[in-house]
Structure formats: structure tokens, C-alpha cells
């Protein structure tokens, strides 16, 4: 039987599990084929690329840190992020006694054609926001949020835009598509 691999654009507020919890929608309402499970997690307040598959060995491979699968994020942060802060992110940050691995990070322009988040992030006219693109090869709980906060720029909106060689592209929130297992 052929392995099924799905790329899903997880909307804000949706859990990365099939069992709903009070106040949060889960994956069970998006019409996925039977037998698929999330290969990783994305917090309910984060958006973007989430892989699902029916192959347990593939899930294990995607989650095992020794394989260092890159994951790329766009983070909208509070304030105008500085190059020094980005350089700190690149070198790694100490969070609760753990030193993160070096990552790729760069300041980027606000993304064009980005869907609106529902609900929108807070808006304060006198405090700007900025965007940073980060590629990590590890995935600790809320790592990007902890990293940006540690350098003085808390994350307001977080979107995973790529997992390994699989970009989210123009896939809209709540939509999914089958991807080729060999590109992982």
C-alpha cells in the first residue's frame, strides 16, 4: 500500500491533533483520509505547514532530531528587529538552560499576499512590527517564540512556511494537498 503524505496549512487556533479540546478546533474537521496522523506539532496559536502521514516510520524519522530536518518560519515580531538581534538568533540562544543550535535568520519585508489572521494580531500605531525569516534544524516546544522574546522582540504571529523541501506555497489556511513522499 502506498504511503500517504499530506501538506496542510494549519489555521490559527487549530490544534495539531485529532481530538478536540474545549475552545479549540482539531484536525478531525478537515476531511483527511482515515489513518493519517500529524508528523510533528504546531501550537494552536501558530499557523502554516504541517505534515500528516499514515506511515509511522516516516513520522519517527521526521521527529527524530538526529535527522535535522529544516523547518522555515516567518515571525512577525513586536518592534523593529535589529541586525544584532538577528545575529544573536543565528548564533543560538540560551532558553531555560538549553542552548539552541545555530540557525539561519534574516530580516524580511512584510510578506505579500499573506492571508489575514482571524483574529488579527493586536495593532498599536506607535509600536511597529517587523518580520524575520528563521530556518531551524530542531524543534523544541515554542522555540521560535522563546528565541525572539529572548532577544527582545516577542513573536506576535508565527507561520511555518516550509518543512524540509516542501514549501507551503499558495496553499490557503484550512486546505491540504497530497505530496510526494520522496521529496521529504
Spans of features found by a protein language model:
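RNA pseudouridine synthases
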Residues: 1-184
Amino acid at each position: 500500500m502506498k504511503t500517504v503524505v499530506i501538506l496542510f496549512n494549519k489555521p490559527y487556533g487549530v490544534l495539531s491533533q485529532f481530538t478536540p479540546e474545549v475552545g479549540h478546533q482539531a484536525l478531525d474537521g478537515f476531511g483527511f483520509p482515515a489513518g493519517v496522523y500529524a508528523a510533528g506539532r504546531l501550537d494552536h496559536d501558530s499557523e502554516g505547514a504541517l505534515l500528516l502521514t499514515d506511515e509511522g516510520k516516516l513520522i519517527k524519522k521526521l521527529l527524530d532530531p538526529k535527522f535535522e530536518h529544516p523547518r522555515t518560519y516567518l515571525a512577525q515580531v513586536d518592534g523593529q528587529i535589529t541586525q544584532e538581534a538577528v545575529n544573536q538568533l543565528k548564533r543560538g540562544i540560551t532558553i531555560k538552560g538549553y542552548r539552541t543550535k545555530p540557525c539561519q535568520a534574516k530580516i524580511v519585508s512584510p510578506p505579500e499576499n499573506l492571508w489575514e489572521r482571524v483574529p488579527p494580531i493586536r495593532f498599536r500605531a506607535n509600536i511597529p512590527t517587523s518580520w524575520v525569516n528563521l530556518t531551524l534544524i530542531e524543534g523544541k516546544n515554542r522555540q521560535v517564540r522563546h528565541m525572539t522574546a529572548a532577544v527582545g522582540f516577542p513573536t506576535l504571529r508565527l507561520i511555518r512556511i516550509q518543512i524540509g523541501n516542501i514549501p507551503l506555497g499558495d496553499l490557503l489556511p484550512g486546505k491540504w494537498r497530497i505530496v510526494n513522499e520522496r521529496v521529504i
